[in-house]
Amino acid sequence: MAAAVSSVWAKPGAWALEAEEHEAELKQQPSPTNQKSSAEDSSDFPSLAAAATTKTKKKKGQTISLAEFATYGTAKAKPAPQTERLTQAELVALPTGPRERSAEELDRSKLGGGFRSYGGGRYGDESSSSRWGSSRVSEDGERRGGGFNRDREPSRDSGPSRADEDDNWAAAKKPISGNGFERRERGSGGGFFESQSQSKADEVDSWVSTKPSEPRRFVSSNGGGGDRFEKRGSFESLSRNRDSQYGGGGGSESDTWGRRREESGAANGSPPPSGGSRPRLVLQPRTLPVAVVEVVKPESPVLVIVEKPKGANPFGNARPREEVLAEKGQDWKEIDEKLEAEKLKDIAAAMEKPNEKSTGKMGFGLGNGRKDEERIERSWRKSTEHSEEDAQEEEPAVEGAKKEETEDKPAVEEAKKEETEGEQAVEEAKKEETGGEPAVEEAKKEETEDKI
């Protein structure tokens, strides 16, 4: 192949064909790994025919006793997992208390030990004042607390923590008497860890019982109504404490709402209210007359019986035929009998006439029969409401029918005469035919004689 490729006179593209042939040969040669994998695949996933032919080996039965069979189905209790226990030597080697610390470790465990050298001195130059939680330096050089380290002195960091010194350090607090609402100076301390006041809940279980109750002031009313006790609100003691603290000359009543109302009333010209109470409203007298409202008692309700409308009548205002004839003074039975008698007469007359089906002149009887049938149908289709009028109209109709019958009688007689005349003509024709037969026989005889 190399020689063919290296030859100068080889066809262009011959090397590509040789490469394809070589790849096809390599593909046809199965590799040993492929053979192994194919054998494993055939065993794991046999074909349907192989799976049907191969038979699985049956396991031999195991003989057990009846007692074992009875206890075989019961669930056996699983043994509890045995935990690995320490040996006696390991138990003795375990520590029984905290390890004694050295002096260096004690120094390290103090508050702020790991952050002393971070960012320069803690309270040194002013460059550290820009950090969050650091001390603030004012213009006059006085240091004031800021952040979580408010009012913390440098000497506090060198000492041990209060939590390490005493288990219950809150009990060693000294209660400082003072009002909780007093305003503190801006530069004074009082952070989270350096609060100067002690909670009342820590001192006494029920501190409400020790709260001094302020007596009500005995105030005399100027209006002559007698003396009374003045009621104070819960916030008046706070206002009095503020006045005493700041030295207000107006007294505790200068900041109350009652005093302000009195001052506003005096400015408007109205008399001041007595005892700091709300001023009474002075309304303008009524000028319009009072409308008299008359109370009208409702009358007793009148029961109105309303007939329920019946369902819609599909026939409208139509009434039975019997009722209409009874109002007119006529008997409907007599009218029905008359109609039936006329009907029977018409039927009998129609039955007497012959039913002829011939054409031409013989068709008069059919026409008369049709007229009779139409007249009968017309008589039965009349409305029941106008029965009287119909009965009156039927009288001339019956007379006209009788006249038609009388007029039709000569026509029928003429037709019968024509029929008889026709029958005679037919008989004459038959006679003529019979008379011509001997002449034919004579002619036949003459022919036979001539032949002889």
UniProtKB/Swiss-Prot annotation:
It comes from Arabidopsis thaliana. This is Eukaryotic translation initiation factor 4B3. Promotes the eIF4F and eIF4A RNA-dependent ATP-hydrolysis activity with different efficiency depending on mRNAs, thus providing mRNA discrimination during initiation of translation. Phosphorylated. The modification N-acetylalanine is found at residue 2. Residues 126-136, 265-280 have a biased composition (Low complexity). It is found in: Nucleus. Pfam families: eIF-4B (PF06273). One of its GO terms (cellular component) is nucleus. GO terms for molecular function: mRNA binding; protein homodimerization activity; translation initiation factor activity. Belongs to the eIF-4 subunit B family. InterPro entries: EIF-4B_pln (IPR010433). The gene is EIF4B3. A motif (Nuclear localization signal 1) lies at residues 172-179. PANTHER family: EUKARYOTIC TRANSLATION INITIATION FACTOR 4B, EUKARYOTIC TRANSLATION INITIATION FACTOR 4B3. Residues 387-397 have a biased composition (Acidic residues). Signal peptide: none annotated. Residues 111-122 have a biased composition (Gly residues). The modification Phosphoserine is found at residues 234, 270, 300. Residues 28-37 have a biased composition (Polar residues).
